[in-house]
Amino acid sequence: MVRISLDVMGGDYGPEVVIPGAARALERHPDIKFVLFGQEARCAELLAKYPKLQASSTFHDCEIAVGMDEKPSQALRRGRGKSTMWKAIDAINADEADVVVSAGNTGALMAMSVFCLRTMQGIQRPAIAAIWPTLKGESIVLDVGATIGADAQQLMDFALMGGAMARALFEVERPSVGLLNVGVEEIKGQEEVKEAGRLIREANIEGIEYYGFVEGDDIGRGTVDVVVTEGFSGNIALKAAEGTARQIAEYLRSAMSRTLLAKIGYIFAKGAFDRLREKMDPRKVNGGVFLGLNGVVIKSHGGTDAEGFAAAIDVGYDMVKNGLKAKIEADLARYHGAEPTEALPPA
């Protein structure tokens, strides 16, 4: 059984997306037990439409929902101990949940997660890891927004955590890790990036294969399993990729509807275009993972639909099933020369 707590009020649409999304995830993973935190007046009628979900859930009524435009400091002051977001996170501390999933305000979710769960021993700052579609399948990119201007040691930590996530998600024994840079030559880039490369190379970490520097176009190519960068450039890369995907989709839509001949051609090529659309569907890779905390936190896109939210739940489910937290702790323990605090799950 995997216990998943949900911030039902999070996101642009709240329970109207979260509840049907949870129902879809339950169809795929019948061993999920949900712990729901929401406002009963808005959720009860909708939840009643999904009897299987209702039977596999416990619901906790909360008085406060965090707004999508609230500042993290304001959300903490107003919602600590009372909001749906805080209580969903705190369910991990109370041993009621193994992972929390929220589509809510990213800054507030990160602030509450750090305040409530704290960072792992040896981790200075957390990172947000995104699953990225590539020509070879999928890769992991971190950090995509949590730590702006990370130093060399923090980038080293991100490499450790990203490698552990790749082993948990992709089930590769020794994932390849690259540092995002302006060139692949050792003399190029900021001092923090060059120093991080030296740290990773000299550490000779058992669980990862250090590839060296990678450039922006290597992300989509799938050159490495894990791309490490600091939060400013990572977030820009993520938003640029999402915008490019939408741009290409719009170009195709416009080109295929411009003339009668184009419309006829689309009919014959519809299968190929459908496969392309599915490959570029952002819902398929929805679910950023907050790494470096004493608990697994999944951030869904705020504007996603039920299928996208279900995909974020899928990510959380896989992270728990494959022992993400234990893998990160074991890698940190090996790097720092200490004993892991939690036993690794059996292979």
Swiss-Prot record:
Pathway: Lipid metabolism; phospholipid metabolism. Keywords: Cytoplasm, Lipid biosynthesis, Lipid metabolism, Phospholipid biosynthesis, Phospholipid metabolism, Transferase. It comes from the Bacteria. It is found in: Cytoplasm. It is an enzyme of class 2 (transferase). The keyword Transferase applies. One of its GO terms (biological process) is fatty acid biosynthetic process. It catalyses: a fatty acyl-[ACP] + phosphate = an acyl phosphate + holo-[ACP]. GO terms for molecular function: phosphate:acyl-[acyl carrier protein] acyltransferase activity. The keyword RNA-binding does not apply. Its EC number is 2.3.1.274. Catalyzes the reversible formation of acyl-phosphate (acyl-PO(4)) from acyl-[acyl-carrier-protein] (acyl-ACP). This enzyme utilizes acyl-ACP as fatty acyl donor, but not acyl-CoA. Belongs to the PlsX family. PANTHER family: FATTY ACID/PHOSPHOLIPID SYNTHESIS PROTEIN PLSX, PHOSPHATE ACYLTRANSFERASE. This is Phosphate acyltransferase. It comes from Sinorhizobium fredii (strain NBRC 101917 / NGR234).
